[in-house]
Amino acid sequence: MIRRFFHTMGRQDRIYKTLSEALKTDKITLYNDSYKHSHHIAMKGVPDTNETHFRLEIVSPEFSGMSRVARHRLVYGLLKDEFDGGLHALQITSSKTPDEVS
Amino acid sequence: MNSMFRFWIPKTSISMQLRMLSTQTRQALEQAVKEDPIVLFMKGTPTRPMCGFSLKAIQILSLENVASDKLVTYNVLSNDELREGIKEFSDWPTIPQLYINGEFVGGSDILASMHKSGELHKILKEINALAPEQPKDSEEETTKKD
């Protein structure tokens, strides 16, 4: 039941849900930039170009003590299934701890 | 360059094939990222980038005044093994990816942050990867010669 519900969610909602739970935060802003990239040659043959490119700003206490690369890797690791399933790019324009924001 | 990533793969079980491909790809990539001071895996080439993020990476390196003889680029669109192998190698799911002196630095987002903060310039300067700036008196010297 839960699994079926999860898979009816769009990619944007799944990304939000995965990150908010794993990183213990609701401070997530996720933009869908897919329309900007749908004409790229690298997107040729991709069946669904509506949910392939996203841009993320996120604040999480889980980032404490981590380098920028480690923070991005953590996020990318949590979304491995999405990348395997057709997510092409996730820009991470901001990944901070609550202390760094205030 | 592309020939580095062509292998003969013996027919064995799938898991063995994957392991062997991975091992050979890994060795080729380990060599590739160490051969030159700055190595960029991108989509397309510096003069014809094929995606916005690869373009951004090239623009940043250009703004940083990286010497052309210090930078080598690999076009992942020309080789599927390279395209997938580099992601496994770096544990990083997207292209472009930048290496400096064999160490993974990041993708276009991190390059943008490091460029903005001055951190990238500092690293590039430390390893002498910047193109020499023209001394101001060179123009004067030219004038004198005339």
From Swiss-Prot, chain A:
One of its GO terms (biological process) is cell division. Gene3D superfamilies: BolA-like. Its main location: mitochondrion. The keyword Cell cycle applies. Induction: Expression shows cellular growth phase dependency, with the maximal expression at the diauxic shift. Expression is rapidly decreased when cells approach stationary phase. By UV light. Expressed maximally (3.2-fold) at 4 hours after exposure to 240 J/m(2) of UV light. The keyword Cell division applies. GO terms for cellular component: cytosol; mitochondrial matrix; nucleus. It is found in: Mitochondrion matrix; Cytoplasm; Nucleus. Disruption phenotype: Leads to delayed spore germination and the unidirectional cell extension is not followed by cell division. Proliferates faster with smaller cell size than the wild-type cell during vegetative growth, but no other significant cellular anomaly, such as defects in septation or cytokinesis are detected. Sensitive to UV light. Shows a normal cell cycle delay after UV irradiation, but displays aberrant septum formation and defects in cytokinesis when released from the UV damage checkpoint. However, chromosome segregation is not affected. Belongs to the BolA/IbaG family. Acts as a mitochondrial iron-sulfur (Fe-S) cluster assembly factor that facilitates [4Fe-4S] cluster insertion into a subset of mitochondrial proteins such as lipoyl synthase (LS) and succinate dehydrogenase (SDH). Required during the last step of iron-sulfur protein assembly when the iron-sulfur cluster is inserted into the target protein. Probably acts together with the monothiol glutaredoxin grx5. Not required for [2Fe-2S] cluster insertion into mitochondrial proteins. May be involved in control of cell division, especially during the resumption from cell cycle arrest. This is UV-induced protein uvi31.
From Swiss-Prot, chain B:
[2Fe-2S] cluster binds at C51. GO terms for molecular function: 2 iron, 2 sulfur cluster binding; glutathione disulfide oxidoreductase activity; metal ion binding; protein-disulfide reductase activity. Its main location: mitochondrion. Keywords: 2Fe-2S, Iron, Iron-sulfur, Metal-binding, Mitochondrion, Redox-active center. Induction: By nitrosative and osmotic stresses. GO terms for biological process: [2Fe-2S] cluster assembly; [4Fe-4S] cluster assembly. It comes from the Eukaryota. Homodimer. Interacts with ISA1 and ISA2. This is Monothiol glutaredoxin-5, mitochondrial. The gene is grx5.
